Amino acid sequence: STAFIQRMAGREQPWLLYHCTRGAHFDNYPNERFLGKSPAKHPYKDTLLELDEILGRLVETLRQTGQLEDTLIFVSSDNGPHMETWPDSAFTPFRCAKGSTWEGGVRVPGLLMWPGMIEAGRQSDGMFYFNDVLPTVLGLAGESERLPGDRYIDGIDQSSFLLAPEGLSN
């Protein structure tokens, strides 16, 4: 991913990088460099340290190539917590967990960063559905006309929610 970011430096065309990690999932196998490095000395917590380093490396590459201020960074999860995993099993204020359609199974945090555009430290309980990512990103890039018109897209442009200090989700 860092090589891709470096290649895209200086280009005027908007680009998208979808960087997925397997870390922090049910089976947690952090890189050996991170085993036992977290204060909890637990594989899940060690994996979080590894993910933090990976994200930090991507952000630093954006900074070094002069692209950070022009980049929206979105970090999230694909589901709620596992009920049966220790030490944080079902550590959630919501009903149920992964594998359920209750809020605890589908409501996850979303962290967004866009220096100069999204207010740092802002918190919201507003809803942002994963299907909103495509229309929102295209809208923010000024490319809404690229949204496919030959099929139904179950998502809406949430740009105003992200950019307005007191923006409300739709």
What does each model-found stretch correspond to?
Residues 22-26, 54, 79-82, 101, ...:
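Solvent-exposed loop/turn segments at secondary-structure junctions
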Residues 81-103, 118-122, 126, 131-170:
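C-terminal cap/loop subdomain of S1 sulfatases and analogous C-terminal strand-loop tails that border
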Residues 2-9, 52, 56-59, 63, ...:
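Non-transmembrane alpha-helical segments in soluble domains
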Residues 15-20, 49, 72-76, 93, ...:
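Structural recognition of the beta-strand scaffold that forms the well-ordered cores
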Residues 2-46, 82-84, 88-92:
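Active-site His/acidic residue clusters
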Residues 10-17, 67-73, 106-108, 169-170:
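Loop/turn elements at helix/coil->beta-strand transitions in domains of secreted/extracellular proteins
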Residues 23, 45, 99, 107-108:
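Catalytic cores of eukaryotic secretory-pathway lumenal/extracellular enzymes that build
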Residues 14, 50-87:
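Metal-dependent active-site segment of extracytoplasmic phospho-/sulfohydrolases and closely related
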